[in-house]
């Protein structure tokens, strides 16, 4: 059996560099001469267009540049059909690279032989410093005919998918490690030492968010690095689904969603939204004596981090309800029930902001009132997300 999988009833000559496999080559006068009915095709692959060259069989066979075709299945099929119509046996090759093995599988599915070449093992002239798609395709075709190319092992689709998954995880871990090192170096440079024992826990991330610098540039740099680390950390967290669902709300970004999830925890421990509002200190206070009842400002009891963050989020509801492009992508990642709650929250809170502003209320009072109701919608979405994933 030849390297290309076809039986040829004639003498054999082993290809050099093709793993010791025999190729359909005639031995004539002590020289290797291919069958004249064969052709060897070199393809220089690229993102948009592939350059193709054809080497006819025989020591003196013509090696010509065939042209460029679109790097699509339809374009490749047309080119292969035109080339194979003139020869009995056609062999294809291209360099391994970022385009993967899709072209290899396409050529094999059409009934032709193909090898994926190891780029580091392609023979090159020491003084040849001109590299173009045309020259590379011609060189591949000529070397394939001469048997000077080394093929790489091509995995099947299942094996490739698993390998890509493992590589993606490894890359994500390396990226996360790099970002953590950058944050640690930044904090050490400015003399900020974490007092706890274990770093990179949720308590450590909260500590990072509480750090303040005198210079705005330092503050912005820290925030950017912390957000990057949190974005890498969240997908592996038990509350990842809750964070993703909360980001469907208008004004709630990554930091707001993560802060709410870390500080509140399981929203199911609150029997009603009003209990959560009280926990966050967003409900009005009261001073009553005898028959006199007096309402005062919010209690400001409980968790101040989430309360402050919700008031900041409430500012976005001063605009009319709409869904931006970035938020539209977020909505595609959540369930239909979460999308309904998010849209209901947007229509109600924008209307409430306008109504309170029309009554002459101060902007701080308006935002606090909107933040109180926003907490109720976040409670509903968090419970819905936990029920969906459980």
From Swiss-Prot:
<keyword id="KW-0238">DNA-binding</keyword>
<dbReference type="InterPro" id="IPR002525">
    <property type="entry name" value="Transp_IS110-like_N"/>
</dbReference>
<keyword id="KW-0815">Transposition</keyword>
<comment type="similarity">
    <text>Belongs to the transposase IS1111A/IS1328/IS1533 family.</text>
</comment>
<dbReference type="InterPro" id="IPR003346">
    <property type="entry name" value="Transposase_20"/>
</dbReference>
<keyword id="KW-0233">DNA recombination</keyword>
<keyword id="KW-0614">Plasmid</keyword>
<dbReference type="GO" id="GO:0006313">
    <property type="term" value="P:DNA transposition"/>
</dbReference>
<protein>
    <recommendedName>
        <fullName>Putative transposase y4qE</fullName>
    </recommendedName>
</protein>
<dbReference type="InterPro" id="IPR047650">
    <property type="entry name" value="Transpos_IS110"/>
</dbReference>
<dbReference type="Pfam" id="PF01548">
    <property type="entry name" value="DEDD_Tnp_IS110"/>
</dbReference>
<dbReference type="Pfam" id="PF02371">
    <property type="entry name" value="Transposase_20"/>
</dbReference>
<dbReference type="GO" id="GO:0004803">
    <property type="term" value="F:transposase activity"/>
</dbReference>
<keyword id="KW-0814">Transposable element</keyword>
<dbReference type="GO" id="GO:0003677">
    <property type="term" value="F:DNA binding"/>
</dbReference>
